[in-house]
Regions:
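Conserved ABC ATPase signature
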Residues: 123-127, 131
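Q-loop/switch helix immediately C-terminal to the Walker
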Residues: 84, 91-106
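The feature captures the beta-strand-to-loop junction immediately N-terminal to the Walker
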Residues: 37-39
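ABC ATPase NBD coupling module
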Residues: 67-79, 93
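Helix-to-loop junction immediately C-terminal to a conserved catalytic motif
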Residues: 52
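Hydrophobic anchor residue at the start of the ABC signature
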Residues: 137
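A short, flexible loop at the N-terminus of ABC-type nucleotide-binding domains that lies
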Residues: 1-5, 9-23
């Protein structure tokens, strides 16, 4: 499966002359892990949102195997994991309810991500950032997922948790031949986990 961005342009209201993303081109193939680095505020998160279909570009488009990403309904093969997991889960739902919305989660993923069963009966605020991020990863890694967009997903976590998560993701990506976009300020991380690195400047 191939995720492509062609002539991708995006600007916020009344900022047409200063687009945050300007005629950007990108291709990610199955099994490829692309690193993306660049200064804060440059538009890396916005790019991820465009690639996942959460935002509509002002010009250009995003295609998945030649089909516009926004045409996908239901479980999209492109999934995104965010830097701040607490912002993308409903604080009023227990984790088992949030997980149920994503469909069946493989027990193998729960085990590999060290997700404790008792966490399922807790609310998001009762978990640490690392624990909650593990849930978000399990939810994003449904069987249909072919491309995973990782936006600074371990930047706020301790070093041990970072290492555990990336070890798991590398193993999972290789096992499934899953494509990945890895956004990070850490060049050391990108060099370790990615097959190629691009600079967003």
């Amino acid at each position: 499966m191939i995720l492509e961005a062609h002539n991708l342009t995006f600007y916020y209201r009344n900022r047409k002359k200063n687009p945050i993303i300007d005629r950007f081109e990108l291709m990610i193939s199955s099994g490829e892990r692309v690193g993306l680095k660049g200064p804060s505020g440059r538009g890396k998160t916005t790019l991820c949102r465009l690639l996942a279909g959460y935002e509509r570009p002002k010009q250009g488009g995003v295609l998945l195997d030649g089909r516009p990403i926004r045409e996908y309904r239901g479980a999209c093969p492109v999934q995104m994991v965010w830097q701040h997991p607490e912002t993308v889960v409903d604080p009023l739902l227990k984790l088992k309810e949030t997980m149920a919305e994503a469909g069946d989660i493989e027990g193998r993923l729960m085990e590999k991500l060290h997700i404790e069963k008792e966490w399922l009966d807790r609310y998001p605020a009762e978990l640490s950032g690392g624990e909650l991020q593990r849930f978000c990863l399990a939810r994003a890694l449904r069987p249909e997922t072919e491309i995973l967009l990782c936006d600074e997903i371990t930047a706020m976590l301790d070093l041990v948790t970072q290492a555990q998560i990336w070890e798991f993701l590398l193993e999972e990506a290789r096992r499934r031949e899953m494509g990945m976009l890895v956004v990070s300020h850490s060049e050391a991380l990108l060099e370790k986990v990615c097959t190629r690195i691009i600079t967003f400047d």
